[in-house]
């Protein structure tokens, strides 16, 4: 699947995630199967504010934002898998494991994010996530969310 083919565009994503500019880091959802996997796209443009200072002569996509983009893709997988959002539940990003950054990402790159649903135990949900640029793995991580039930 390429970046021209998608199942959720930015308008759909805005209806799924609470994040907004400049912190919304997913542009499209390319593929999805509930409770199994999700493929997302992040376009990197020099106009993004963090590139102005990270770094001035050699702009590099910050690793911490790579993890955030991967987490947002995992959140879309959760929210689309459960269908209707429950206002009495919150999902917290609580952990990362075995994270490796293999290559730098620069303006003009497209980051393809592949999220694999690993397991859910009690209220913890675990994902294996890969970030890919030009068919090369630039980052991989295991990300953990915690589902908390809240009551009004």
From Swiss-Prot:
It comes from the Bacteria. It catalyses: a (3R)-hydroxyacyl-[ACP] = a (2E)-enoyl-[ACP] + H2O. Gene3D superfamilies: Hotdog Thioesterase. It holds the Pfam family FabA. Keywords: Cytoplasm, Lipid A biosynthesis, Lipid biosynthesis, Lipid metabolism, Lyase. Involved in unsaturated fatty acids biosynthesis. Catalyzes the dehydration of short chain beta-hydroxyacyl-ACPs and long chain saturated and unsaturated beta-hydroxyacyl-ACPs. Belongs to the thioester dehydratase family. FabZ subfamily. One of its GO terms (biological process) is fatty acid biosynthetic process. The active site is at residue 54. It is an enzyme of class 4 (lyase). GO terms for molecular function: (3R)-hydroxyacyl-[acyl-carrier-protein] dehydratase activity. Its EC number is 4.2.1.59. It is found in: Cytoplasm. Signal peptide: none annotated. CDD domains: FabZ (cd01288). One of its GO terms (cellular component) is cytoplasm. InterPro entries: FabA_FabZ (IPR013114), FabZ (IPR010084), HotDog_dom_sf (IPR029069). This is 3-hydroxyacyl-[acyl-carrier-protein] dehydratase FabZ. Transmembrane segments: none annotated. HAMAP family: FabZ. Coiled coil: none annotated.
